[in-house]
């Protein structure tokens, strides 16, 4: 009888996990290259990827760089309204707002994407509260509204979200996503909007106050965001838990960054944000420049750090030690291969914090390590992908 009860509890736990599949598409960068627009984009955009993090007044204005999303390849589908209107979004642990284009937006970027129409939803409730998210060449401005958001099998009712009225530049016209679904803490949400996952938990729609992410390395499909639980089939060994050092982003403390047993950065410890909404692995400019030089990467006319694909067979691992556990990244992880050749998965940025230099552990890292974002205990769980 005890075994039957245990089996039933395990089955109940598995059923309680809501999985949202992510598909892999061409990135915004690749689309801009194919349309001959990347050089113009780079001329007009702020070169600082750090602009996404720590805005001056997060309750009023969230500052983000479009360049953070340029190499994103993983996207999921949500529905907003009754009946649901579908949108392709980035599930972004590095921001906290949900926003999508609306019919109020006539910018070129909006015209090429799905736009939310409040008049076609029987459950929409409008507000007169503005929202503004600043980018390098202008702002996404709009209004906040409430409606039911369908995420996987979850109907997240009375969810606040942004309806864009203007979107910056024509470059988002080629973006493979409609909007952003932020999964960071409410402390960094623009206009004080309650994030989607917080609302799910407050409404009792998930069984555990956590979500987890698996990013597939090579398949067009297979990647997934899981709400309310952990599926151990996606990782090997045990999850190692790392305390969140500052609630806002999913920020943790890193002990060191080494190569060939030698510290190449973060020798006295540093901070890192685990961010599904940043494709590359970003760190202090000087440290990244040294890494790029060591691995033989050089900048091309598109601003990418290109590298010989043969280097994958000869370069060493780069090892992040976090909470006493080593997390190696092999060259096959930090060198990104495509039909056009190979590029470095590292990106330089300067954003010192009160606790030391800051790194961003983006998709280059998460493809290697299954990640659990545990709000109940304010910790991140990491384990090698299966």
Swiss-Prot record:
The GO cellular component terms are: extracellular region
Question: Which biological process annotations from GO are given for this protein?
Answer: digestion; proteolysis
Q: What is its main location?
A: secreted
GO terms for molecular function, please?
aspartic-type endopeptidase activity
Under the heading SUPFAM superfamilies, the entry gives: Acid proteases
Reaction catalysed by this enzyme: Preferential cleavage: hydrophobic, preferably aromatic, residues in P1 and P1' positions. Cleaves 1-Phe-|-Val-2, 4-Gln-|-His-5, 13-Glu-|-Ala-14, 14-Ala-|-Leu-15, 15-Leu-|-Tyr-16, 16-Tyr-|-Leu-17, 23-Gly-|-Phe-24, 24-Phe-|-Phe-25 and 25-Phe-|-Tyr-26 bonds in the B chain of insulin
The EC number(s) this enzyme carries:
3.4.23.1
Q: Does the keyword Cell membrane apply?
A: no
By sequence similarity, the record places it as follows: Belongs to the peptidase A1 family.
Query: Does ATP-binding show up as a keyword for this record?
Result: no
Signal peptide span: 1-15
Species source reads Canis lupus familiaris (Dog)
For this protein, the record's Pfam families field holds: A1_Propeptide, Asp
List, for all copies, the residue spans of the domain called Peptidase A1: 74-383
Intrachain S-S bonds? 105-110, 266-270, 309-342
**Entry protein name:** Pepsin A
What residues form the catalytic site here?
92, 275
Give the source's domain of life in one word: Eukaryota
Q: What does this protein do?
A: Shows particularly broad specificity; although bonds involving phenylalanine and leucine are preferred, many others are also cleaved to some extent.
Q: Where in the cell is it found?
A: Secreted
Sorted alphabetically, the keyword list is: Aspartyl protease, Digestion, Disulfide bond, Hydrolase, Protease, Secreted, Signal, Zymogen
